[in-house]
Amino acid sequence: MKITVIIPLRITEGLYQAQERLSRIIENIPSGKFNILIVNYGTPKKFSHILSGLKSYSHLKILDFDTGSQIFSIGHARDLGVQYAEDNVVLFNDIDFFGNKDMYERIYAEVLARDMVNSIYDFFCVPVFFLTENGTEDTLSSSHYSECSENSYIHRKIYESHKDFVEFPAYGSSAMVVNKHHYLAIGGHSREFYGHGAEDYDVLHRLSSYYSKGPKTADYYNNTKSNRIDNYHGFRAYFALYGIDVFNRGIFFQHLWHPTRSIPGYHQTQRNFSLLENLMKKFDQDKEQPFPLSNANIKDKTLFLIDTKSRTFKAIRHLTPLFGSLVFMSENLFSNIDSLLRYINKNEIDRIFFLNPYGNEHRLALYEGVKEKNIPFIVFDRGALPDSWFLDHNGFNYDSKSYSPEAWQQQLTHEQEDEVENYLFNLRNSEHTLEHNSPRKTSRFLKELYQIGDRKVLFVPFQRPTDTVTTYFAGPAGSVNGFQCWVEYIAENLPREEWVIICKNHPLEKNLPRVNGVLYAEDDTHIHDLIDLADKVLLMNSGVGLISLAFMKPVICASNAFYAHEGLAIPAFDAIHALELINNDVLVDKRKVLQFYWHMLNRVYSFGQSTYNKTKSCDGTDRKIINEILFNKINYNNQTIILGTSPQGISLDAPLFYSFGGREKIMEIFKSSNAKSNGTKVVVDTSTVKDSKSHIQNNSANSSELKINNVKEDKRKPGKFGRKVRKLIRTPGAFFNDAIKNRKSNTGDLKFRQ
């Protein structure tokens, strides 16, 4: 593994000691562990010899951009560097930063310790200490026994706050160390910034939303204009959390002194900081971010047929780095397949990205036209397993050859079998499902509840009449209504003394007509309990069928299902055939179930935790709109990309918060913030800091609710904790006085811990 060091620059007369400082950086970066990418953002020709003289270094590349007529944008230059970086992790290294070889070794070791190749949501800042002129001379003229001892000497001087050495610190600095995939996905720097000023804080704000180390400050959006770490106020203090810990491990850069630079139009401090607050609030409210950046190392060009104002667009951004050069356009801009084909040919598009192609008739026509012309495409939608999604270049659901036996029937190794067995065990015993279900109650409880006795159970889960698979892949049943007719026929002909038919409506479908002669489970009854209870499962083509195979239950399909193959689920041709299958022995081939599941888990399905917003369709039925997907693994085109999970928060009792006064001082700051704002409520999670979305939500101009871990006031009859919360809300002064008095003997009422 290597790390790409990105150096953005434009060499001019005003760039102090440009050649000397650049050469020093290159000499100090270990070639075996780092690659160097210089982004030449419009250096005039008369200074080009400085860069030409560097081309002999094997670990260095120079990207030249003809941007000399534009204001120098260090943010844009960094973005370009990430787009062309060949390594999975990047480090931003400005020309005035100084670190010796040992310091870069420490940075490399930190990246390895965090496994940042496979944990993409993790990041840190290399703290930067701005040296005085004397401090710069001292650093560059030092003659220590080793680089390690030199770094210890400098670290001590910084720690002891020698004013003649360091002018000021920046713990949450622009020297970010970040995963390339993640950076491309969030879009890099906002294109709204002009010149220099505040652009790094916007990036840090968004990066930190995926990895929150603690509660955000009560006045988070406030620019305190101070980088000190003794007061937990404003966003600068919050971003410092991403550099304090690595500084304590001896990792830092020194910013070498230089005369004040005067570049017309470059410094846009006032304008950009005003813009920063608006961008931060937009992101917190609506997840507004710049468009994802193209990955220049993937030469394909992909057209995404998607509305960039939609929540789906925001949710899929961590898929985009896989698809090279990115073009985003609404499908409605193409009146028919001919107009789409013209655009593809004119703009040299290599691939089309579709959301569910059966989502509407217009999209389906475009999809079928693209397939007919053998144009490469990719289809994205939710899978049948919890947290599963698929990127399929063969088709959609039943119409895809990705599920054909030749794709998945292969001998598994013992390790592969163990992997699948472990997944199936966890799936069967988990409460996690695609749709909301109540807590599990066991199949034994249901057997008593429904008075099953010794009878067998046929479980029938219904689907929504408007779903894609019940509309386009309805097969022999024809429709949900047709399938209900099957169930009614079977109910009339199955001996009631031998069988019980238990039906369950889809959680979002409240108005489906009921079938006579069957039992109905409550809408929120846990689907796993019902499957576990069943002897056989009859359905159209629901994902419940795939989960039922994990329980090794015989599954009979009345419609076209992608998992209906010999040894797995069995297709029925009509209601009479379905009845015969119910009455006869039907076996599930465990070996084939393991093979199919291994294929799904390692070749077809990607996985990511998602959040949804509930809304109403135009016909009044309930509907869920995707809000966010935090992918942890992506399977695409025989590649597996591990993204990892969003790191957990850190306890307020951790040394990370000592400089801010620890838990007690930080809670006092929240209390003081409440006193200054009218009607503020503090709602505190007394267990852990786990939610990376902790922030203040302003409910009105004069009233706000400080949400820590998004835990809201409990409206139920209060117990001991509830009474304390009420006291906290109504009389915060008395609450905190009592809490401080009792802190030594009772530390469990008001705390953050892991």
What are these regions, as identified by a protein language model?
Residues 82, 106-191:
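Conserved catalytic core of nucleotide-sugar-dependent glycosyltransferases
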Residues 68-84:
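Glycine-rich, basic loop-to-helix element that forms the pyrophosphate-binding segment
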Residues 17-18, 195-300, 683-686, 734-749:
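C-terminal catalytic/acceptor-binding lobe
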Residues 87-100:
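Short beta-strand-to-loop acidic/aromatic patch adjacent to the donor-nucleotide binding site
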Residues 12-29:
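Short, well-formed alpha-helical segments that are part of the catalytic scaffolds
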Residues 399-448, 568-684, 688, 723, ...:
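Leloir-type glycosyltransferase catalytic cores
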Residues 40-54, 485-521:
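Catalytic donor nucleotide-activated moiety binding site of glycosyltransferases and closely related
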Residues 16-18, 440-507:
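Conserved catalytic-core segment of nucleotide-activated headgroup transferases in glycan assembly
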